[in-house]
Amino acid sequence: ASAACNEAIQKYGADKVTNGTIGAIMDDEGKLICIPTVEKVLRSLPTNELAAYAPIIGLPAYLEAVKNLTFADNKPDGYLEAVATAGGTGAIHNTIWNYSEIGDSVLTSDWYWGTYNVLCQEAGRKLETYELFDENMNYNIESFTDKVNTLLADQDSLLIIINTPAHNPTGYSLSEEDWDKVLDVCKEHAKGGNKKITLLVDIAY
């Protein structure tokens, strides 16, 4: 999407194209800007907070805030822990490397952030896709189910990346009904204990 936008800018002119593909704010002259409140807070931090190394796992207060933001009042009863990574891309990279096997396939939808494929290739994995939407533009649980069945027939574990809410690039968010169906498929494969499924929910947006 970013490359296509840049091509459109070259073809039609920067004054006629708005680039909304990159997560950065530019002014009218194309220069990077920062939200004033964010800049004010960053500049007010003492040097030891701004420049010192944090613990490898992350600052305890930050980790607790992450769990509260992610789950709010719906924290699961099971094991729950947070780990800091070098940005959202770092979290995806760590998950691919640690929760899938070299040579195996990782599953996501056919509309996806291109970096997923790059991260899989760098880690020696293959990115496979299912059709995100059916003919009525609803979540395509049939395609999801078929692809999960096919991949788990050939491998013992499967990492599934689901980008929701506000899926990039479609903006789609899975409904509670969609989630129930996705989890039913995963539970069916995992109940025997011979297959392992890891769900990576990319909540970047």
Explain the meaning of each model-derived region:
Residues 46-198:
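Conserved core of the PLP fold type I
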Residues 82, 203-204:
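Conserved Walker B
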Residues 1-56:
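N-terminal "arm"/small-domain region of PLP-dependent enzymes with the aminotransferase-like
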